[in-house]
């Protein structure tokens, strides 16, 4: 992300927000159907879906594509814009600050900036993912004779009415843990893989200054794998906290009590599968826009 870091403070921040928003929206459209399946696997009350394929098949046969796989996309689409804008602007601004005012090593700058970016993003993400998770499992809950909202605004209104404005941040602790550690893994993997690929192929072309398209795509896909693999148990806990209105400790106890250790990894396969194209697109689009 050298192009973004070279610009002035205000100009760079504005461009990071714009470019991050566009990249985030594109990535969300790619990953959302897979995310719906993941959330349903994570939050099922019993072993309704023994496999990922059984969940996909059930969702398609009973709800179709739009209502089944894209239920509740409006909220996370806006959230993806806010999340990625926050991630990239926080990361690049923190990197600039550390580079200018400290003697922290380049790797240290990446790790610290990634953690700061993830922490900031968690504040934006919690309300968005709360609404998203509720909508993604709403059709299942309606089928089980529970009255649930299946639209964004009524869902938000119901949360505020029942729990107040602070209720929108149900699951903040789980999201903070996931995003702070995940931010480190996400940015560090991207920067390290990109630099490694660039350095290796610079031997053939010493004058080449920019990364090739395939290098950006591989780096972004690798970052997505690292992020999701490293924080998946925290993501499972967060999903249960938000769909069942329980604390972090109770969510951990409930998951482990019902499914054991493997319960924290339900839906991991499809999550890693979706992580590659979605994150490859996010980083490629962001880097391309930043270079304009």
Curated annotation (Swiss-Prot):
Transmembrane region(s): 14-34, 69-89, 104-124, 171-187, 213-233, 267-287
Cellular component annotations (GO), alphabetically ordered: mitochondrial envelope; mitochondrial inner membrane; mitochondrion
Name the record gives this protein: Mitochondrial ornithine transporter 1
Family: Belongs to the mitochondrial carrier (TC 2.A.29) family.
Role this protein plays: Required for arginine biosynthesis. Transports ornithine synthesized from glutamate in the mitochondrial matrix to the cytosol, where it is converted to arginine.
PANTHER family membership: MITOCHONDRIAL BASIC AMINO ACIDS TRANSPORTER-RELATED (PTHR45624), MITOCHONDRIAL ORNITHINE TRANSPORTER 1 (PTHR45624:SF31)
InterPro entries associated with the record: Mitochondrial_Carrier, Mitochondrial_sb/sol_carrier, Mt_carrier_dom_sf
Cysteine disulfide partners in this protein: none
Predominant cellular place of this UniProt entry's protein: mitochondrion
Gene assigned in the entry: ORT1
Keyword Transmembrane: yes
Additional comment: Present with 432 molecules/cell in log phase SD medium.
BP terms from Gene Ontology: L-arginine biosynthetic process; mitochondrial L-ornithine transmembrane transport
Intervals holding Solcar repeats: 11-97, 105-196, 211-292
Subcellular location, record wording: Mitochondrion inner membrane
Molecular function GO labels: L-ornithine transmembrane transporter activity; transmembrane transporter activity
Source superkingdom: Eukaryota
Annotated keywords: Amino-acid biosynthesis, Arginine biosynthesis, Membrane, Mitochondrion, Mitochondrion inner membrane, Repeat, Transmembrane, Transmembrane helix, Transport
Source organism of the structure: Saccharomyces cerevisiae (strain ATCC 204508 / S288c)
Keyword Membrane: yes
Membrane topology listed for this record: Multi-pass membrane protein
